[in-house]
Amino acid sequence: MKPFGQRLGRFSVKTLLTGLLGLALTLPAVASDTPDLDTIKERGTLRVGMSTFVPWAMRDKQGELIGFEIDVAKRLAADSGWQVEFVPTAWDGIIPALLAKKFDVIIGGMSVTPERSKSVLFTAPYSHSGVQLAASKKLAEGFSKLEDFNKRNVKIAARRGAFTVQVARETFPKASVLQFDDDAQAFQEVINGNAHAVIASSPKPEHESIKHSDSLFLPFSERLSKGNEAFAVRLGEEDKKAYFDQWIADRTADGWLQARYEYWFSTLDWQDQIASGQ
């Protein structure tokens, strides 16, 4: 029988070699599956996951995508020498689609939240908006306080999978929250008199209350919440985050992001461009 030390040494070397071989076989597969910054540069195209909601991203009368997020993604790609490919995705499935590598980054007005940060890596914020409520003049007549909407017979509409659903549930825990695939459907539910109010990212409630002043009003002068929007990439993609952070810093410093935000969020100069039903 061989000494214990000799047997242990041989076993350890064999085990080590086996482990290193397995690691060597695994690493290339992991690297090739990760569309990191170098892969985007080689491809020459940035694939952007987004969802349509006014004025972040929407269709014009020719069917082309326009909006704040579209401007941001196009400028990012142009500054980087890339093409841009937009991947329209249902909002409630946009994070799973990112994790499934359907695209490289989410640029879609996504608010930074602790819960989302468990699944994705956020960049520095590139815009700062918030959430507001528009109410039905018919069903919510005389409502002016938060507690007026926090009742069991009150129905509040919101876009499925959006941060607004969380705001609705936390602010009005007694009310029923009705979820729809997009903001347009949620607002239409209130306009039709089937819900007391709709919660959406500003300035959608403000704009819709002006457009439909006969049926909608803003009961609160202050927004329900203020938030930060950021790009989202997959956890561990620090190279992409650093690159995007620098771009955001540059476009913030030269005033471009603020100028585009003010155009899309503080004016209605673009309104005659968009297709109906959005």
Task: Enumerate the language-model features and the residues they cover.
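Ligand-binding clefts/hinges and TM-proximal coupling segments of bilobed small-molecule sensing domains
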Residues: 33-34, 163-177, 219, 248-278
